[in-house]
Amino acid sequence: MALTVEQKAEILKEHGRKENDTGSPEVQVALLSANINGLQDHFKGHKKDHHSRRGLIRMVNQRRKLLDYLAKKDRTRYLQLIEKLGLRR
């Protein structure tokens, strides 16, 4: 469910603009996407876990807001990111 330190470091290295970049929208969206994918797998076996589902919805909304921000500020970075992550928008 939660990402390990190694998984986070791999995402930072792959999507970061600099070495220790944790604040750029690309990194934040990639981390949220990894968490969302983990929670979706969790719900396949725990259908009635509504408490975690609330957290999932919150993460999806946060990712949507960050993607909207990135699309408004820099359309090319936005298009590259959704293609790299395989998001449909």
From Swiss-Prot:
Gene this chain is encoded by: rpsO
Oxidoreductase in keyword set: no
Gene3D superfamilies linked to this entry: 6.10.250.3130, S15/NS1, RNA-binding
Protein's organism: Alcanivorax borkumensis (strain ATCC 700651 / DSM 11573 / NCIMB 13689 / SK2)
Official protein name in the record: Small ribosomal subunit protein uS15
Origin: domain of life: Bacteria
UniProt keywords, alphabetically: Ribonucleoprotein, Ribosomal protein, RNA-binding, rRNA-binding
Signal sequence, start to end: none
Self-association and partners: Part of the 30S ribosomal subunit. Forms a bridge to the 50S subunit in the 70S ribosome, contacting the 23S rRNA.
Protein family (similarity comment): Belongs to the universal ribosomal protein uS15 family.
GO molecular function: rRNA binding; structural constituent of ribosome
GO cellular component: cytosolic small ribosomal subunit
Pfam families reported for this sequence: Ribosomal_S15
InterPro entries in alphabetical order: Ribosomal_uS15, Ribosomal_uS15_bac-type, uS15_NS1_RNA-bd_sf
Gene Ontology BP term (one): translation
Keyword Ribonucleoprotein: yes
General function of this protein: One of the primary rRNA binding proteins, it binds directly to 16S rRNA where it helps nucleate assembly of the platform of the 30S subunit by binding and bridging several RNA helices of the 16S rRNA. Forms an intersubunit bridge (bridge B4) with the 23S rRNA of the 50S subunit in the ribosome.
HAMAP family: Ribosomal_uS15_B (MF_01343_B)
